[in-house]
């Protein structure tokens, strides 16, 4: 554990900070409750089942996500007037989910669930998106599909994104800035041209050198 997921949990408010501050767009949110942050932060987890409700249909899951910014009351969650909009969103993913609105999410494949979780996390306006190793539990082919769809959504929405990954190729190919952490500290921070000049061998060399210095 280098502290990557702990850092994400601090940002999202899942755990409290012992020291320091969490500042988003110049606003100190350190003391803000997790449910309040959730309205402005989208998060996709490593486990495909973590970002969706398996016993609810695709339609019901999307309806819940659609209300995230507004909050939940005692009114009907699923609005028939939004079905066509949901179907259109899903059709753009190319996975056939637009024909599965009435299907229980628990019966979908891991890749379909992860893409649905990604779409749900970005349906409403958010300050930024957090991806917590969201392709790690998928087979290589599905991981590539999910990663390309992720890049498509992030670019279309011009969305600031923090992605934790052990896939160095993904980090180099998709990231604008690369941070490497070890024992809770940032040991590498590259952006712009410095980042563009990096390759996987160099990053592995840095990692191995740090491991040796720490006695591993």
Predicted regions and their residues:
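Helix-to-loop junction immediately C-terminal to a conserved catalytic motif
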Residues: 12
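H-loop/switch region of ABC-family ATPase nucleotide-binding domains
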Residues: 165-166
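Q-loop/switch helix immediately C-terminal to the Walker
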Residues: 56-71
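ABC ATPase NBD coupling module
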Residues: 28-42, 50, 72-75, 79, ...
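Catalytic Walker B motif of ABC-type/P-loop ATPase nucleotide-binding domains
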Residues: 129-132
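Conserved beta-strand-loop-alpha-helix hinge in the C-terminal portion
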Residues: 185-209
């Amino acid at each position: 554990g280098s502290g990557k997921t702990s850092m994400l949990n601090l940002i999202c408010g899942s755990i409290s900070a012992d020291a320091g501050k969490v500042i988003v767009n110049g606003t100190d949110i350190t003391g803000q409750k997790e449910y309040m942050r959730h309205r402005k932060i989208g998060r996709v987890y490593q486990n495909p089942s973590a970002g969706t409700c398996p016993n609810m249909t695709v339609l019901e899951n999307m309806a819940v996500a659609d209300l995230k910014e507004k909050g939940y009351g005692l009114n009907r969650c699923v609005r028939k007037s939004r079905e066509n909009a949901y179907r259109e969103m899903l059709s753009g993913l190319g996975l056939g989910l637009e024909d599965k609105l009435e299907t229980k999410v628990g019966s979908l494949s891991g890749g379909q669930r992860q893409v649905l979780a990604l779409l749900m996390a970005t349906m409403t306006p958010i300050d930024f998106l957090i991806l917590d190793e969201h392709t790690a539990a998928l087979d290589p082919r599905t991981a590539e599909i999910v990663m390309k769809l992720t890049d498509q959504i992030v670019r279309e929405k011009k969305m600031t994104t923090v992605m934790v990954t052990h896939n160095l190729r993904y980090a180099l190919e998709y990231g604008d800035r690369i941070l490497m952490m070890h024992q809770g500290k940032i040991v590498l921070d590259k952006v712009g041209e410095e980042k563009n000049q990096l390759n996987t061998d160099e990053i592995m060399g840095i990692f191995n050198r740090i491991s040796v210095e720490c006695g591993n």
